[in-house]
């Protein structure tokens, strides 16, 4: 509905503010889909619980390390903060000894943020989008006819059909 309202405002020449979407998003594919479905109006994705969890896990790991009581689910990945947090060495290289005083909750949050960043970059590269503002609704297709009808995103069996037929019938100059 927000996208439809923004479309109507734009069609009337009204100013459309940058919009943000919230609602249980937790992974990079969620972020990509929100930005694509809301393009060009949605510029941000709000994440609440998804960001709190790695912070709380990091805080718990810090407590367990101090108590020398790491659960097996954590100790299978390492026995120190350097081994458990994949981005710890990066922070240590950037901030030196100061990184040793960083709360592990913050390091957990940073590590999760880096995972989101790299994953989003990979999805964007795969879809040939090298800037956030180039992501668009044309980067998506609906898996069901009902989803296509509701969203206005082309159904998977129809998406890029004309382009494919043109290549088949007329050939392709660049291959």
Whereabouts are the PLM-identified features?
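Glycine-rich phosphate/ribose-binding loops and adjacent secondary-structure elements
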Residues: 1-85
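C-terminal extensions of enzymes
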Residues: 53, 80-175
């Amino acid at each position: 509905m927000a996208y439809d309202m923004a479309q109507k405002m734009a069609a009337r020449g009204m100013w459309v503010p940058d919009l943000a979407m919230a609602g249980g998003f937790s992974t990079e594919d969620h972020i990509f889909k929100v930005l694509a479905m809301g393009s060009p109006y949605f510029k941000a994705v709000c994440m609440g619980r998804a960001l709190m969890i790695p912070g709380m896990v990091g805080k718990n790991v810090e407590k367990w390390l101090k108590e020398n009581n790491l659960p097996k689910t954590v100790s299978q990945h390492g026995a120190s903060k350097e081994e458990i947090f994949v981005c710890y060495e990066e922070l240590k290289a950037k901030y030196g000894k100061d990184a040793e005083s960083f709360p592990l909750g913050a390091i957990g949050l940073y590590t999760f943020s880096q995972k989101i960043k790299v994953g989003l970059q990979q999805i964007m590269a795969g879809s040939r989008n090298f800037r956030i503002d180039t992501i668009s609704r044309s980067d998506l297709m609906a898996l069901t006819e009902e989803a296509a009808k509701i969203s206005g995103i082309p159904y998977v069996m129809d998406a890029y059909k004309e382009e494919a037929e043109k290549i088949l019938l007329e050939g392709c100059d660049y291959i």
